[in-house]
Amino acid sequence: FSEVLLLGALGGKRLEHTLSNLCTGLGLEERGVRATLQNERSRITFVMPGETRRYPKEDYFYFSAFPMEGRAEGVCEQGSYYELTDAELTAGYPLGVSNEYAEGSDCITVSTREGALVIVETVAD
């Protein structure tokens, strides 16, 4: 198989299980399997080093990018309210949190040169 959709992998009463499921998603991506974790409010995917992915707006409003391995370099986001160009994201400074689609944009494009990203898309409140 080339894609996996994990339902029931987010939320719940045990945060450590959610974190473990994020790690599982990264492990699948490292093996060439496209991983998506989804619940009723959020969808989580990954952008691997050297990869560019497009995120159509659909029903999502908020868009966040976090370095899954502690640091990501050469991060670019286009089509977002706060665009990034050759940025460095670190776990200690969450620069990529709570972004939005730019006015008139129906897609955000994300790439990373080094370090995997976890992408969180969330519906508006």
Give the location of each predicted region.
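Anionic-ligand-binding alpha/beta catalytic cores of soluble enzymes and soluble regulatory domains
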Residues: E3-R54
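Long, charged alpha-helical interface segments
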Residues: S42, V47-D125
